[in-house]
Design a protein with these regions (language model features):
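Short strand-turn segments of transmembrane beta-barrel domains in outer membranes
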Residues: 69-72, 82-88, 92-116, 138-139
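Repeated loop/turn-to-beta-strand initiation elements of outer-membrane beta-barrel proteins
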Residues: 124-127, 160-165, 221-224
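Transmembrane beta-barrel strands of outer-membrane/channel proteins
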Residues: 98-102, 131-133, 165-171, 250-252
């Protein structure tokens, strides 16, 4: 019998560990317009010149991310895997996604490679891994950026006990225009493109995170009717089955 593919996705956005269902991962048929890193972050952003792996801040205050404890690293938030942003899955069949995107515009070379695999071991236990590699070359000389990002996770959701665990890492580097070598050149007769600039400015950032949450729930059983489709004597018929679900009354 063919098992239908169903994928559930959620996050633990707060340390109170209340699960929050989110949109399914980007696919060719679903949410593909959100696959761009900057557009996924905000529809209106300010960057430092590179299309990918550049310090970024949303012009829309409500869209800004403050998931990193260090205020000086908030500009890297969209590229970092934090425990609050970690996605957890539950699938009826193993799910994998491999994508490669490349920008062919002259002077703005971009490479974006992503990989995701997740699957269940039984109904309650799920394991998965996700990795991303970004590489971009900016319009000006000596501007470039790289990002290596990944995470591994596991979740167990039983009738009474649940567990979520994850480990994420992000490592990025960005070479940018470091500004004018001498600000007094602004008063000179040089054209803007001829002003001497610092071309060796570099930013490197590494972020590691680990997360583990255990929860136990006192539940109440409730029966409900579920209709299933079966074939009898060459005919398709529907039969009702009685199933039991557990309604949480109190969690610890």
């Amino acid at each position: 019998k063919r098992i239908p593919t169903r994928v559930k996705t959620w996050q633990m956005p707060a340390f109170s560990a209340i699960a929050d269902t989110i949109a399914f991962t980007d696919t060719a048929m679903l949410n593909y317009h959100d696959i761009d890193w900057q557009q996924r972050y905000s529809m209106s952003s300010t960057t430092n010149g590179n299309v990918l792996v550049s310090p970024i801040a949303s012009r829309i205050v409500q869209d800004r991310l403050y998931t990193i404890d260090d205020p000086f690293a908030w500009c890297w938030s969209p590229y970092v895997v934090t425990p609050q942003q970690q996605r957890y899955f539950n699938t009826t069949t193993p799910f994998s996604s491999v994508a490669y995107k490349k920008g062919f515009v002259s002077g703005h070379e971009e490479n974006d490679i992503s990989f995701l695999f997740t699957g269940n071991i039984g109904k309650p236990l799920n394991l998965g891994v996700e990795m991303d590699y970004l590489n971009s070359v900016g319009h000006y000389a000596n501007t470039a950026g790289k990002l290596y990002r990944g995470s591994v996770w596991g979740s167990y959701n039983g009738a009474h006990y649940s567990m979520h665990a994850s480990f994420g890492w992000s490592q990025l580097s960005s070479f940018d225009n470091g500004g004018l070598q001498d600000v007094t050149d602004l008063n000179s007769s040089l054209n803007p493109e001829d002003l001497p600039t610092r071309l060796n400015a570099m930013t490197a950032y590494r972020y590691l995170s680990g997360y583990l949450h255990n929860q136990y729930a006192i539940t109440k059983e409730r029966e409900y009717t579920n209709s299933i489709e079966v074939i009898e004597d060459g005919k398709r018929v529907y039969k009702d089955t009685i199933k039991v679900e557990h309604i949480p009354l109190m969690t610890f």
